[in-house]
């Protein structure tokens, strides 16, 4: 047993940290596990395999469970994935992996761990370890209605480039509470897969941005942020309506967005 492996007392399973070499193991477990949670964002499930905590449990014969919740922004770890193979106890492995992740968390600066739930089976496992619900994420959809773009006279809207990412990350950090902020690494990943991304400038300084993706199902407004001091001036509305017109002009008649149930300002905007 190596220094990276740990077998808890009385447990039939061994835990170790993952590495990039575990890509095929992770892919197989996530593909076949009857219970699996995968965080919804712009990263792949393999992007954090060399980071901590990212754990795998195994017995003498096979790899049986995964848990990853490494930080991406300061102090915040989202549960990136959790999966358990068929025929092994989900609750017991969750508790085992979670306790190991929790013991690692302080060493990597994690003070808060969150989970974006998409399946109800995971809720009692989280609650059993002290998680509590803080908000809900809701889904809104636009279906092809013509819109008017009204940009404030003092602002300029243009296509985003990779050179804007530092400024975009600064806007994002100031616009959101820590739990909902994204790192420049995450924003770069979002930019790479975006179908349409724009920024708004005032006095040649980026004060707002949006990034949207598209698929056979339609477009999706993946991220939008406005400098707090520039909010309530119509800038966010201009970014949204400009994106709607862009996709409408390309024959895309549906666009979706997710937002928090307690974020009334964004709901009014959308």
Question: What is each model feature region?
Answer:
Residues 138-161, 253, 258-264:
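C-terminal "cap" of GNAT-fold acetyltransferases
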Residues 180-182, 189-202, 206-215:
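Phosphate-binding active sites in nucleotide-utilizing proteins
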Residues 41-99, 103, 202, 207-222, ...:
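Conserved donor-binding loop and adjoining core beta-sheet/short helix segment
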Residues 7-26, 156-168:
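A short beta-loop-alpha structural element at the N-terminal edge
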Residues 17, 28-41, 170-182:
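Helix-loop element at the rim of GNAT/NAT acetyltransferase active sites that forms part
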Residues 90-103, 226, 232-245, 249, ...:
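Conserved acetyl-CoA-binding loop-helix of GNAT-fold acetyltransferases
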């Amino acid at each position: 047993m190596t220094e990276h492996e740990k077998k808890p007392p009385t447990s039939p399973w061994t835990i170790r940290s993952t590495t990039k070499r575990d890509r095929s193991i992770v892919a197989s477990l996530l593909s076949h596990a009857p219970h699996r949670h995968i965080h919804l964002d712009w990263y792949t499930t393999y992007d954090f395999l060399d980071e901590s905590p990212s754990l795998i449990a195994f017995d003498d014969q096979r790899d049986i469970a995964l848990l990853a919740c490494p930080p991406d922004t300061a102090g915040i770890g989202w549960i990136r994935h959790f999966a358990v193979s068929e025929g092994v106890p989900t609750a017991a492995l969750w508790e085992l992996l979670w306790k190991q992740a929790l013991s690692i968390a302080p060493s990597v600066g994690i003070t808060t761990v969150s989970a974006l739930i998409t399946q109800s089976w995971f809720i009692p496992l989280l609650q059993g370890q002290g998680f509590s619900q803080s908000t809900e994420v809701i889904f809104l959809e636009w279906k092809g209605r013509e819109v008017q773009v009204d940009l404030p006279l003092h602002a300029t809207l243009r296509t985003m480039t990779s050179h804007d990412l530092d400024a975009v990350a600064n806007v994002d950090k100031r616009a959101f509470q820590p739990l909902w902020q994204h790192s420049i690494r995450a924003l770069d990943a979002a930019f790479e897969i975006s179908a349409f991304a724009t920024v708004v400038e005032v006095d040649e300084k980026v004060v707002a941005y949006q990034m949207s993706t598209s698929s056979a199902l339609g477009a999706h407004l993946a991220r939008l942020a406005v400098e707090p001091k520039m909010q309530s001036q119509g800038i966010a509305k201009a970014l949204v309506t400009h994106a709607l017109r862009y996709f409408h002009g390309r024959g895309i008649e549906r666009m979706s967005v997710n937002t928090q149930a307690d974020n009334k300002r964004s709901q009014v905007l959308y």
